[in-house]
């Protein structure tokens, strides 16, 4: 696998935390990683993506005084136990970090190598912050395809979370820049997403799966959930397996 990096300084920075198997090709292009003030960023189609778990939005989500967000309600249900959760689609890592802040242990998968490196860098920075270190340490991040992982692992989990990263709404101007890039870079096709739910059920990797969907979307893989948690623009389909 090759990842194009814009300069040697970035390569030296990445070498601290990525596997030796990755090779780099240095060239100018529309999609590349670069280092700015010791922060790893992605340049893509004249847009910029930077992941920071110490920003105000994340800090508000994980504040104990803040009402539990929908993904937490859907995954925890009425349980007060600390869960082991497989997050099959890391994306920007916000849901993963929010769940880890609740005391849960996360194994988080991201198949896109660019997003993986951004997340890895963000987690390492969070590990250097006293009030975020414990949260970040509950997250294990792996650069792999979710379907492949589920079909080959011998691990089991209390819950599997699937966020297919559906395309942005028609009013794309209202979608934040980071989400615009995420939809373009990390979007999975519907067949892959349907296979993911099928594989979760087939392998019996967990007794519960939670799938995030647009509010009016069809059920993933045409499988009716056991229950649902609905919001204004999206919903969480909950499967008891």
Swiss-Prot record:
UniProt keyword list: Cytoplasm, Methyltransferase, rRNA processing, S-adenosyl-L-methionine, Transferase
Keyword Methyltransferase on entry: yes
One cellular component term from this protein's GO annotations in UniProt: cytoplasm
Gene3D superfamilies the record matches: Vaccinia Virus protein VP39
InterPro entries tied to this protein: 16SrRNA_methylTrfase_J, SAM-dependent_MTases_sf
Enzyme Commission code: 2.1.1.242
Chain residues that bind S-adenosyl-L-methionine: 94-95, 163
UniProt cross-references to Pfam families, sorted A to Z: SAM_MT
Localisation: Cytoplasm
UniProt GO molecular function: rRNA (guanine-N2-)-methyltransferase activity
Catalytic reactions on record: guanosine(1516) in 16S rRNA + S-adenosyl-L-methionine = N(2)-methylguanosine(1516) in 16S rRNA + S-adenosyl-L-homocysteine + H(+)
Assigned protein family: Belongs to the methyltransferase superfamily. RsmJ family.
Function: Specifically methylates the guanosine in position 1516 of 16S rRNA.
Protein name: Ribosomal RNA small subunit methyltransferase J
Annotated organism of origin: Francisella tularensis subsp. novicida (strain U112)
Lineage start: Bacteria, Pseudomonadati, Pseudomonadota, Gammaproteobacteria, Thiotrichales
Gene: rsmJ
